[in-house]
Amino acid sequence: LEHLTLSMGAMLAGVPFSAISPAYSLISQDFGKLKHIFEVLTPGMVYASDGQVFSKAIQTCATSDIEIITNTGIVGQQSCTSFQSLLDTPVTNVQEFYQTLDEHQIAKFLFTSGSTKLPKAVPTTHLMLCVNQQMLLQTFPEFEQTPPVLLDWLSWHHTFGGSHNVGIALYLSL
């Protein structure tokens, strides 16, 4: 839920985000795909649920000016911001940021699997996310009468899990 909270906050603030496959951090030994993604995105913030688990990947790929957010654990000697401290921050200017959102702004970047080479960034706008959900509702009008029960194991870094299924839950207020 922390990832979803950060994602929704980023979209509301008009800051594009990207969910990255954990395999690029936890299975890869050279972090080649993750390094490539860092070069493409130049992130200002990185979130890892457990800093210690993702420490090697973060230390290898993230520059010292990138803010690291964790639920637990530390990343080497690097200073990390706790996720809880973000929740404890007083809310300001939300309406102001909301008013500046444009449907054509990039909401998030999805990445291809990289099975043919390096992962490629796929920009996804706010409009694309909304239109996709409206298309689903028109394709499956019964969703409005009887909302589906989602048993979801799909990763949020994948378009099906992160856009389709999360979108259904948000769009139908599940």
Where are these regions (language model features)?
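Conserved AMP-binding/adenylate-forming
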Residues: 1-28, 148-155
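Short hydrophobic alpha-helices that are characteristic scaffold elements of the AMP-binding
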Residues: 7-19, 36, 40, 158, ...
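A short helix->loop->beta-strand "cap" motif at the edges of active sites that frequently abuts
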Residues: 15, 43, 63-67, 174
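Conserved ATP-dependent adenylate/AMP-binding module captured primarily in the ANL superfamily
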Residues: 24-60, 88-91, 132-151
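Conserved pre-ATP/AMP-binding loop-to-beta segment of ANL
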Residues: 69-71, 75-111, 117-118, 142-150
